[in-house]
Swiss-Prot record:
Organism placement in taxonomy: Bacteria, Pseudomonadati, Pseudomonadota, Gammaproteobacteria, Enterobacterales
Entry's localization field: Cell inner membrane
Binding site for ATP: 46-53
Free-text function comment from the UniProt entry: Part of the ABC transporter complex MglABC involved in galactose/methyl galactoside import. Responsible for energy coupling to the transport system.
The UniProt record lists the keyword Ribosomal protein: no
Keywords: ATP-binding, Cell inner membrane, Cell membrane, Membrane, Nucleotide-binding, Repeat, Sugar transport, Translocase, Transport
Catalysed reaction equations from the record: D-galactose(out) + ATP + H2O = D-galactose(in) + ADP + phosphate + H(+); methyl beta-D-galactoside(out) + ATP + H2O = methyl beta-D-galactoside(in) + ADP + phosphate + H(+)
Family: Belongs to the ABC transporter superfamily. Galactose/methyl galactoside importer (TC 3.A.1.2.3) family.
Principal localisation: membrane
PANTHER family attached to this UniProt entry: CARBOHYDRATE TRANSPORT ATP-BINDING PROTEIN MG119-RELATED (PTHR43790), GALACTOSE_METHYL GALACTOSIDE IMPORT ATP-BINDING PROTEIN MGLA (PTHR43790:SF7)
Enzyme class: translocase
Organism: Shigella boydii serotype 4 (strain Sb227)
UniProt xrefs under Pfam families: ABC_tran
Protein name as annotated: Galactose/methyl galactoside import ATP-binding protein MglA
SUPFAM superfamilies per the UniProt record, alphabetical: P-loop containing nucleoside triphosphate hydrolases
Length: 506
């Protein structure tokens, strides 16, 4: 609810001051501040576990703060639900979109607040009002289209338009570009800037440092539940922000490339997948100890390559040769037996069993190998291997019985990589391995990948982050519309060259 506290000077739309929140045995927020001006885009940054989510849950009334004050447009607020916050002008666009896929766009826009004509929903008015908002924000989507037929970026636009329809003054955006193409990101940024022009205060959460400098005016950094700093972006460098986030200076974003790739271990020739639209005539070699990147725009069929190699997609033509011997992976089990491992793109939906413990998640890809002679599971060896995953992958956890869903994204990813290493692969394929992972944890993942390459593993990495590919790979295979448009040496190529190749067959 909104109290009648005396308004502040009006410099800020939102003032969260001295916010404290504790849970049993843990002080989650310790005197945290967040102040957002109108007509501004404010980055909220910190590693996973820094307190960003807890702070926002206190704002939305999901958690009740222990102490501190929250002022919105000069008046003290104390919301008890996200619905109450939304109705009072504070909205959030979540990373996991909150739309009903079976309903139309305009149904989603006005859900639970439909305009009516007598006893019936006024469909014409709903269409007109949706279209008017879309026109104002330059959103080209048919209000009558079913949401389930739209792209992720279009769904993001609907969420933003929905916030606009509530006349939101504060809009919080949580990793809004994680699944968007560069063109879609630019369109999203245009809409965000329109909201800024109209007087909104935008709180922008992202692990993509380049976006923060491209878009935001100010930044607030949290670390270990404490407020570290609020500063204008203009006076900061990327290294300074990283140092504030992690509490130390990161002298380098990527490990040194000390490894020299060896002989060819994998030869792929004219690989074509059966499912349409498909990859066509994909050819490349992978060397022992090499890190091969795969670049391309969304829709380039990068993931199709590793899924075909892993037996998830059926190939219709081409050959796969491992150590000079031609093989066929008809399914994932055959691929594992041939020494392939695949860390999938969607960590939470296809990579982990969030409500089960680290032990289960560490062993599930290799569980059949833990049966003893009488068919029972060897619990001692299972515990030992789980501990190996925790130790060798440097997983930060109280123990192997910890629910994996409670870990940070970086630690979840380490468990997944460790799980696959238990299968003793020669070829490790990673699809967007650092998506949604904070900057400190990213470096740890890069170190693990570099160490595995040094041990002779052949590694294939798909990434939408160009600095990541240029920073950790030896060569980059560029895809465009299902075709290989080039393979470049990372030492001599440029981002512009990769983007040119990625657009070659569009």
């Amino acid at each position: 609810m909104v109290s009648s506290t005396t308004p502040s000077s009006g410099e800020y739309l939102l003032e969260m001051s001295g916010i404290n929140k504790s849970f049993p045995g843990v002080k989650a927020l310790d005197n945290v501040n967040l102040k957002v001006r109108p007509h501004s885009i404010h980055a909220l940054m910190g590693e996973n576990g820094a307190g960003k989510s807890t702070l926002l849950k206190c704002l939305f009334g999901i958690y009740q703060k222990d102490s501190g004050t929250i002022l919105f447009q000069g008046k003290e607020i104390d919301f008890h639900s996200a619905k109450e916050a939304l109705e009072n002008g504070i909205s959030m666009v979540h990373q996991e979109l909150n739309l009903v896929l079976q309903r139309s766009v305009m149904d989603n826009m006005w859900l639970r607040r439909y305009p009516t004509k007598g006893m019936f929903v006024d469909q014409d008015k709903m269409y007109r009002e949706t279209k008017a908002i879309f026109d104002e924000l330059d959103i080209d989507i048919d209000p009558r289209a079913r949401v389930g037929t739209l792209s992720v970026s279009q769904m993001q636009m609907i969420e933003i338009a929905k916030a606009f329809s509530y006349n939101a003054k504060i809009v919080i955006m949580d990793e809004p570009t994680s699944s968007l193409t560069e063109k879609e990101v630019n369109h999203l940024f245009t809409i965000i800037r329109k909201l800024k022009e109209r007087g909104c205060g935008i709180v922008y959460i992202s692990h993509k440092m380049e976006e923060i400098f491209q878009l935001c005016d100010e930044v607030t950094v949290l670390r270990d539940g404490q407020w570290i700093a609020t500063e204008p972006l203009a006076g900061l460098t990327m290294d300074k922000i990283i140092a504030m986030m992690v509490g130390r200076s990161l002298n380098q974003r990527f490990p040194d490339k000390e490894n020299k790739p060896g002989e060819v271990i994998l030869e792929v020739r004219n690989l074509t997948s059966l499912r349409q639209p498909s990859i066509r005539d994909v050819s490349f070699d992978l060397h022992k100890g090499e890190i091969l990147g795969i670049a391309g725009l969304v829709g380039a069929k990068r993931t199709d390559i590793v899924e075909t190699l892993f037996g998830i997609r059926e190939k219709s033509a081409g050959t796969i040769t491992l150590h000079g011997k031609q093989i066929n992976n008809h399914n994932a089990n055959e691929a594992i037996n041939h020494g392939f491992a695949l860390v999938t793109e969607e960590r939470r939906s296809t990579g982990i069993y969030a409500y089960l413990d680290i032990g289960f998640n560490s062993l599930i890809s290799n569980i059949r190998n833990y049966k003893n002679k009488v068919g029972l599971l060897d619990k001692s060896r299972m515990k030992s291997d789980t501990q190996w995953v925790i130790d060798s992958m440097r997983v930060k956890t109280p123990g192997h019985r910890t629910q994996i869903g409670s870990l940070s994204g970086g630690n979840q990813q380490k468990v997944i990589i460790g799980r696959w290493l238990l299968t003793q692969p020669e070829i490790l394929m990673l699809d967007e391995p650092t998506r949604g992972i904070d900057v400190g944890a990213k470096f740890e993942i890069y170190q693990l990948i570099a160490e595995l390459a040094k041990k002779g593993k052949g590694i294939i990495i798909i990434s939408s982050e160009m600095p990541e590919l240029l920073g950790i790979t030896d060569r980059i295979l560029v895809m465009s519309n299902g075709l290989v448009s080039g393979i470049v040496d990372t030492k001599t190529t440029t981002q512009n060259e990769i983007l040119r190749l990625a657009s070659l067959h569009l």
